[in-house]
């Protein structure tokens, strides 16, 4: 779905992406969002010293992995370039049909350079740039309040490119440790939405309140790992037999019971290009 990029083109070989950014895209302080913001943000995300656990999301990009590992030091060799203020060119190692899905992940979002540098070095962790009053973002909401273990409040961002269509004035997020407590609060109308439901409540919602339960596809695969260095699982034939014997339908129906889909391949079925 187009957001800060209004459109994009993909080369015939699937290795080059050209993103066209909206001219009216703004940071929450009014600064324009530019292609260079993405270049700098991805440079920061790949800094070895930052220790970004999601750096691998960018590894399909030419030389991104080598840069993150410190094998090369010249970021100009990494396949991301700002052709002008509103045009971003990304070159991949191979055709990666799910690359656009990777860009849905928050680790690929641009960050505001001036704000980060005002509170420390780009690769420094734990600085105050994310605190209320400091944080500058480019989404539909801005951070207003963050009280640890109490509440996070965000308010509508007047500089958002599509602010006219943002219907909510704000959102309150309540951290709740106990999933049963959270479900009761949702049922009582104290919460408008929850992403966590006790397993034993899912069947009840499906039966009595199906309109209040929505199961989204998740780009991930759950699996059980075995020690294949010890007998009998060191025998490939035994592993193949176990694979054939497992009733995946029964596992998701009677064990996990969370709306999972039986996995017959390691790649999730909703992966683009699969």
Language-model segments: residues:
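Protein kinase glycine-rich loop
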Residues: 1-10
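Charged, glycine/proline-rich intrinsically disordered loops and linkers
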Residues: 55, 59-72
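Residue-level recognition of beta-strand termini and adjacent short loop/turns
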Residues: 11-12, 82-84
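Extracytoplasmic/periplasmic ligand-capture domains
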Residues: 16-18, 22-51, 129-135, 140-261, ...
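Beta-strand-rich interaction surfaces with strong enrichment in secreted/lumenal proteins
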Residues: 7-8, 77-79
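A short, aromatic/hydrophobic, helix- or strand-capping loop or linear motif
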Residues: 50-59, 114, 256
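Gly/Pro-rich hinge or "lid" segments in bacterial periplasmic/extracellular proteins
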Residues: 64-66, 75, 85-86, 92-170, ...
């Amino acid at each position: 779905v187009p957001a800060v990029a209004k459109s994009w083109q993909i080369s015939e070989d699937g290795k080059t992406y050209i993103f066209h950014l909206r001219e009216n895209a703004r940071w929450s302080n009014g600064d324009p969002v530019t292609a260079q913001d993405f270049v700098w943000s991805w440079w920061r995300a790949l800094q070895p010293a930052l220790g970004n656990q999601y750096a691998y999301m960018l590894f399909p990009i030419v030389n991104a992995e080598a840069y993150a590992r410190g094998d090369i030091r010249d970021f100009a060799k990494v396949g991301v370039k700002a052709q002008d203020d509103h045009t971003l060119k990304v070159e991949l190692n191979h055709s990666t049909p799910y690359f656009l899905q990777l860009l849905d992940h928050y680790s690929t979002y641009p960050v505001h350079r001036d704000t980060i540098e005002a509170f420390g070095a780009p690769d420094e962790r734990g600085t105050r740039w994310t605190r209320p009053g400091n944080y500058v973002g480019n989404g539909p909401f801005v951070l207003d309040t963050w009280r640890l273990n109490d509440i996070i409040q965000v308010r509508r961002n007047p500089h958002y490119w599509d602010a006219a269509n943002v219907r909510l004035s704000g959102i309150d997020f309540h951290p709740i440790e106990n999933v049963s407590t959270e479900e009761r609060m949702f049922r009582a109308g104290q919460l408008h939405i929850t992403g966590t439901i006790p397993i034993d409540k899912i069947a009840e919602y499906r039966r009595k309140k199906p309109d209040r339960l929505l199961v989204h596809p998740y780009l991930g695969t759950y699996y059980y790992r075995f020690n294949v260095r010890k007998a009998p699982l060191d025998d490939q034939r035994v592993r193949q037999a176990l694979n054939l014997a497992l009733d995946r339908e029964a596992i998701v129906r009677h064990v996990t019971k969370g709306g999972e889909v039986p996995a017959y391949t390691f790649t999730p079925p909703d992966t683009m290009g699969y």
